A protein has these predicted regions:
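Gram-negative outer-membrane beta-barrel transporters
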Residues: 438, 556-558, 562-577, 585-682
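Conserved C-terminal beta-signal and adjacent last beta-strands/turns
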Residues: 255, 539-548, 601-606, 610-612, ...
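Extracytoplasmic beta-strand/coil segments of soluble accessory domains associated
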Residues: 22-67, 94
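A beta-strand signature from Gram-negative outer-membrane beta-barrel systems
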Residues: 69-75, 80-123
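Structural signature of Gram-negative outer-membrane beta-barrels, strongest in the C-terminal barrel
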Residues: 346, 358, 363-373, 378-382, ...
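Repeated loop/turn-to-beta-strand initiation elements of outer-membrane beta-barrel proteins
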Residues: 121, 147-150, 187-192, 279-282, ...
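Predominantly transmembrane beta-strands of Gram-negative outer membrane beta-barrel pores used
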Residues: 60, 93, 108-114, 121-130, ...
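Acidic/polar loop-and-plug regions of large Gram-negative outer-membrane beta-barrel proteins
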Residues: 169, 182, 191-269, 294-340, ...
Length: 740
C-alpha cells in the first residue's frame, strides 16, 4: 500500500549573496524551459520525474557533463547531489540531447558546479519548515591571484520528514562537501579545475514513508483506516533492528535500518576547457568515484484478516510488550513485509571529452564517452509480520507462534539479489545544429556505443538446465532441495548500441511555424538487470520517440502543440505474485507504447504577470504482457495485461504556473499539477482517482544581498493514495467489481 503524503508544509529560505556568479555556457537549444523540475511534492530536495509515457524511472542528473551516478540502484542521485548553493547552473536537457550524449532515455537535469570568481563571493541558503527541517547550503569562492581560483561548498540536511518515526530522528540526514581549485592559463583561453567531493547520506525516507494502510472504497477513492492519518502517521514498526542472512557468506547477521541505508561517496573530478585560435572549443572531464551505495526497502506484501471465517484458529500471533512479556495479538489485521537491504561497493571512472565549433549558421560537436563501472552488490531479504494499528499508534512486530518463535523468516527467499563485476561503455557521438535558411532549422545527431559487461551473478541452473530460483536461507554455497550447489554463474556480454535524433523547425511566418523531432534509441540491459534468480531477456531494447506539431509566438504568448508517439520493447521486470500466504517471483519481458498530445504555453498578458500552462493527454498500453507462476498447492497464477493501460501512469497531466510581481522586489507564485486516474494493478481491477499537487509561495528580494522566501506545499490539503496495492497483482476486474 502506498500512501500519498498530504501534510501542509511551510518552508522558509534565506539567501545571502555578495557577488553575482558567472554561469556556464549552456545552449538553450539543448534544454527545456518552464518545467520546475526541483519543485517536487514527493521530496523536499530532489528532482521530480517528468512523465514521457513510460513507467516511472529515476531522473537522470548530470553534473559538469557527467552522470552524478552511473547506476541509481543502489546509489541514488539524492544521496550524492542536491540542487544547492554549490551549483552555478541547473537546467533540463531535452530528450534528444540526453539520448545522444548519455545513451539514456528521458529528460536529464543538467547542472554545473560553481567555480571560483574574481574577488570574494559567498552564498548561504537556509531552509526550515514547521516540522523541524534544518537545511544549510554554503558556497564561498574567490581568487588567489595569478589566475588561480578556489571554491568551497558545504551542504547539511537535517530533515525529520512530515511525521515522526521511532527508529531515527531524521528521515533524511545528508552532508555533502566540495572543494575546487581552478587555474586559468594561456591568456584565459584555457581553464583547468580539480574538484574533490565527499558525501554521506542516510536516505531513511526511502523505506519509512512509502506505504500506509487504507480502505479501498471501490470507486477510486480511499478511506482512512481507523485513526491512521495518511501522510502524517508512520506505518513503520518501532523496532530499528533487522536480522538478515548474508547472501555472500550464509552468516546470520544483525544491523539497524539506519546503518543499512548509509551511502558514502568520495570523488575526484578533473575538468579542462580550452578555446583554440581557430574557434575550436575543447572540453574534457574525468571523474573517479569510490563509494558505498545503499537502498533499503520495507515492502508491504499482503494483509491477513485474522477475524475472517477462513482464518479463525489458523494463526496465533504474539508480541512483546514494553517489559518484554509475551502477549497475544488481538488486532484484526496482520501486515506481512519484506525487508530488502540493497548495498554495493562501487568504483566508477567516467570520462567525457567534446570538440565543438560555431560556424556562421551552425554549431558542430563531436564527443567521446568512456565510462567504467565496477560493483560488488547484493540484496539481503527478510520476511516479517507487523500489526496494523487502527488507533493510529506505532506498529509492532509480531510473530505466528504456530509456525515460529521469532520475528524473522524466509531469509533471501523472495527477492534476494547478487551480482559482481564491471560494465564499460565506450561511445562516439556528434550533433549538428544548423540554420539551413532564415526559416528552417535542423538539429541532428547520432551515437554509437560499445557496451561490455563481465562478471558473475546468482542465476543458477540445475542439472536439467532449469533455473533453481531462490529458497529460504539462500546464499552462495548453499544447496538447493534438488542437490544443486549454489555457486556464482559467470557473465560476459558485448553489445553495440546506437541512437540517432533529428529535429526540424520551419517558420511559416514570423510568428507561426511547424516543429517536429524523432529520436531512436537502441539499448541492452544494464548490469543491474542480472540481479534476480533468472537471466533477463538480452535482446535489444528499442525506444522510438516521434513528435510533430505547431508553434506560435508573439509579444505576449509562446505556444507549442505536439502529437507524440513513444514505445519501448523488451522491458525486463519481476513480479512478486501472491496466492494465499505464499509469494513467488515471476520474471517477464514486455513492451509498451504510448500515443499522446501535449500543448505547452507561456503567456505574459500584462506587466508583472506570467502564466505557464501545460496539458498532456496520453494513452500508455502494455504489449506482449503475459506471465504465469505455479504455487506449491498447484494453483497457477496467470496475468495477461496486453492492451491494458500501464499501471501508475496517468492519462491526463495538467500544469498551471501563474506568478505575479507585486512590486519589483516581491513575487507571488503558485503551481498546480493534476494527475488523472491511475490503475493500481496490472489487470485494471483497482484504480485511484485523479489528484492535484499544489505549491505556492512569496519571494522577496529584501536587499541587494538578502532574499527571503516562504513556500506552502499542498495548500488544497488533498489526501489519498497513489501507486500500487500490495498483493493485488492477480486480482481481476470481475473479482474487484463487488468491492465497496
Amino acid at each position: 500500500l502506498n500512501g500519498k503524503s498530504a501534510a501542509m508544509m511551510l518552508a522558509l529560505s534565506l539567501v545571502n549573496v555578495t557577488a553575482a556568479f558567472a554561469q556556464d555556457d549552456n545552449s538553450s537549444a539543448k534544454e527545456e524551459g518552464n518545467r520546475n523540475v526541483m519543485l517536487n511534492a514527493a521530496s523536499a530536495n530532489g528532482p521530480r520525474e517528468i512523465q514521457i509515457g513510460l513507467p516511472s524511472a529515476d531522473v537522470n542528473v548530470l553534473e559538469n557533463g557527467l552522470p552524478v551516478t552511473y547506476a541509481t540502484n543502489p546509489h541514488s542521485v539524492n544521496t550524492i547531489w542536491r540542487g544547492d548553493a554549490s551549483l552555478s547552473h541547473q537546467g533540463l536537457l531535452k530528450i534528444a540531447e540526453t539520448a545522444i550524449t548519455t545513451g539514456n532515455i528521458g529528460y536529464a537535469v543538467n547542472s554545473f558546479t560553481q567555480k571560483g570568481q574574481k574577488g570574494f563571493n559567498g552564498t548561504l541558503n537556509y531552509k526550515s519548515n514547521h516540522f523541524g527541517l534544518q537545511e544549510f547550503s554554503l558556497n564561498m569562492n574567490g581568487d588567489l591571484g595569478k589566475d588561480w581560483y578556489y571554491s568551497f561548498n558545504m551542504y547539511q540536511d537535517f530533515d525529520p520528514g512530515t511525521f515522526k518515526i521511532k527508529s531515527t530522528p531524521y528521515q533524511d540526514r545528508t552532508q555533502i562537501y566540495k572543494a575546487l581549485l581552478t587555474k586559468k592559463y594561456n591568456g584565459n583561453r584555457g581553464e583547468f579545475t580539480a574538484m574533490y567531493k565527499y558525501a554521506n547520506s542516510h536516505n531513511v525516507y526511502n523505506y519509512a514513508t512509502q506505504s500506509a494502510p487504507f480502505i479501498y472504497v471501490g470507486d477510486g477513492s480511499v478511506k482512512e483506516y481507523g485513526n491512521f492519518k495518511l501522510g502524517t502517521t508512520s506505518y513503520l514498526p518501532i523496532d530499528n533492528e533487522m536480522t538478515y542472512h548474508d547472501m555472500r557468506t550464509g552468516e546470520l547477521k544483525q544491523t539497524s535500518l539506519y546503518d543499512a541505508c548509509l551511502n558514502k561517496a568520495s570523488e575526484v573530478t578533473l575538468m579542462n576547457n580550452y578555446r583554440f585560435d581557430n574557434g575550436l572549443n575543447w572540453k574534457a572531464t574525468l571523474k573517479y568515484d569510490h563509494s558505498r551505495g545503499a537502498m533499503v526497502y520495507q515492502t508491504p506484501m499482503s494483509i491477513v484478516d485474522l477475524k475472517s471465517d477462513a482464518n479463525k484458529g489458523v494463526y496465533n500471533y504474539m508480541y512483546r510488550d514494553i517489559d518484554g512479556a509475551v502477549k497475544a495479538y488481538n488486532g484484526q489485521y496482520v501486515q506481512t513485509r519484506m525487508s530488502c537491504l540493497n548495498a554495493g561497493k562501487i568504483d566508477e571512472a567516467l570520462f567525457t571529452t567534446e570538440l565543438s565549433k560555431k560556424f556562421s549558421t551552425s554549431t558542430f560537436r563531436l564527443g567521446v564517452n568512456e565510462w567504467f563501472y565496477h560493483i560488488d552488490y547484493c540484496s539481503n531479504t527478510t520476511m516479517y509480520d507487523q500489526s496494523v494499528p487502527a488507533d493510529g499508534n506505532y506498529a509492532l512486530r509480531i510473530w505466528d507462534a504456530n509456525k515460529r518463535d521469532s520475528y524473522f523468516y524466509d531469509f533471501n527467499k523472495n527477492a534476494s539479489e547478487y551480482y559482481k563485476g564491471s560494465e564499460n561503455k565506450l561511445a562516439l557521438y556528434f550533433t549538428h545544429d544548423w540554420d539551413v535558411t532564415n526559416k528552417l532549422n535542423l538539429y541532428y545527431g547520432a551515437r554509437l556505443e560499445w557496451q561490455k559487461l563481465k562478471g558473475e551473478n546468482a542465476a543458477v541452473k540445475n542439472a536439467k538446465g532449469e533455473f533453481v530460483g531462490r529458497f529460504a536461507d539462500y546464499n552462495l554455497g548453499a544447496t538447493a532441495a534438488d542437490g544443486t550447489k549454489i555457486a556464482p554463474a559467470d557473465l560476459s556480454y558485448n553489445w553495440l548500441n546506437y541512437d540517432f535524433s533529428v529535429a526540424a523547425t520551419y517558420k511559416l511566418t514570423d510568428n507561426f511555424g511547424f516543429t517536429g523531432d524523432f529520436t531512436y534509441i537502441v539499448q541492452h540491459p544494464k548490469f543491474e538487470a542480472f540481479a534476480p534468480a533468472t537471466l533477463p531477456n538480452t535482446d535489444k531494447i528499442s525506444v522510438p520517440l516521434g513528435r510533430a506539431g505547431i508553434y506560435y509566438n508573439n509579444s505576449w504568448l509562446s505556444l507549442t502543440s505536439l502529437f507524440s508517439y513513444i514505445s519501448k520493447t523488451n522491458n525486463n521486470s519481476t513480479l512478486n505474485l501472491q496466492h494465499g500466504s505464499e509469494i513467488k517471483a515471476a520474471p517477464l519481458t514486455y513492451d509498451i507504447q504510448t500515443w499522446g498530445w501535449t500543448t505547452d504555453a507561456v503567456a505574459h498578458p500584462f506587466k508583472g504577470f506570467d502564466f505557464h500552462f501545460l496539458f498532456t493527454y496520453q494513452k500508455p498500453t502494455y504489449k506482449k504482457y503475459e506471465t504465469s507462476i505455479t504455487f506449491s498447492d498447484g494453483y497457477v497464477g496467470k496475468i495477461n495485461a496486453t492492451g491494458n493501460i500501464v499501471a501508475e501512469i496517468p492519462q491526463i497531466l495538467i500544469e498551471l504556473d501563474p506568478s505575479y510581481m507585486i512590486t519589483k522586489d516581491i513575487k507571488l507564485w503558485t503551481s498546480f499539477r493534476y494527475f488523472s486516474k491511475t490503475y493500481a494493478n496490472i489487470n485494471e481491477a483497482y484504480y485511484f482517482n485523479g489528484h492535484w499537487e499544489t505549491f505556492g509561495g512569496l519571494n522577496w528580494q529584501a536587499t541587494k544581498r538578502l532574499a527571503l522566501g516562504c513556500t506552502v506545499v499542498n495548500f488544497l490539503n488533498q489526501t489519498g493514495a497513489k501507486g500500487s496495492i500490495a498483493g493485488a497483482e492477480l486480482i481481476t476486474k470481475d473479482e474487484a467489481k463487488g468491492i465497496k
